[in-house]
Amino acid sequence: MQFKVLAALVIGATLAAATGSPSNQCNTGSLQCCNSTGSATDPAIAKLFALLGINVEDVTALVGVTCSPITVVGASGSSCSEQPVCCTNDSFNGIVALGCAPINLNL
């Protein structure tokens, strides 16, 4: 009886450890493939912000430039040879994406 309880605990702990979220998952926004990323204070990005009417002072996180969505990681045709990022605001038709964080798709 004690062996069965111990075995159940070991198996349960192993399964719990194996079900953590992968680091290639985007939990807070959309998965994007951007041609470049940078700070809002970068002169080229600041020019884009001026054209789009975005206040540079309001943006503190990484910015993605010329982005397209990545729909299914690992599916054919959905690779990202540039910078894969997870962005919280991609409402500028791919020109810029705000609140981005780099992720690793090679895991």
Curated annotation (Swiss-Prot):
Coiled-coil spans in chain: none
Induction / repression: Expression is induced under conditions of inorganic phosphate (Pi) deficiency.
Protein location: Secreted; Secreted, Cell wall
First and last residue of the signal peptide: 1-18
Gene Ontology MF term list: structural constituent of cell wall
Alphabetized SMART domains for the sequence: HYDRO (SM00075)
One cellular-component annotation, GO: fungal-type cell wall
Assigned keywords, A-Z: Cell wall, Disulfide bond, Glycoprotein, Secreted, Signal
Sites where a glycan is attached: N35, N89
InterPro entries tied to this protein: Hydrophobin
Disulfide cross-links: C26-C86, C33-C80, C34-C67, C87-C100
Protein family (similarity comment): Belongs to the fungal hydrophobin family.
Function: Aerial growth, conidiation, and dispersal of filamentous fungi in the environment rely upon a capability of their secreting small amphipathic proteins called hydrophobins (HPBs) with low sequence identity. Class I can self-assemble into an outermost layer of rodlet bundles on aerial cell surfaces, conferring cellular hydrophobicity that supports fungal growth, development and dispersal; whereas Class II form highly ordered films at water-air interfaces through intermolecular interactions but contribute nothing to the rodlet structure.
Subunit structure as annotated in this protein's UniProt entry: Self-assembles to form functional amyloid fibrils called rodlets. Self-assembly into fibrillar rodlets occurs spontaneously at hydrophobic:hydrophilic interfaces and the rodlets further associate laterally to form amphipathic monolayers.
Protein name: Class I hydrophobin 3
Lineage: Eukaryota, Fungi, Dikarya, Basidiomycota, Agaricomycotina
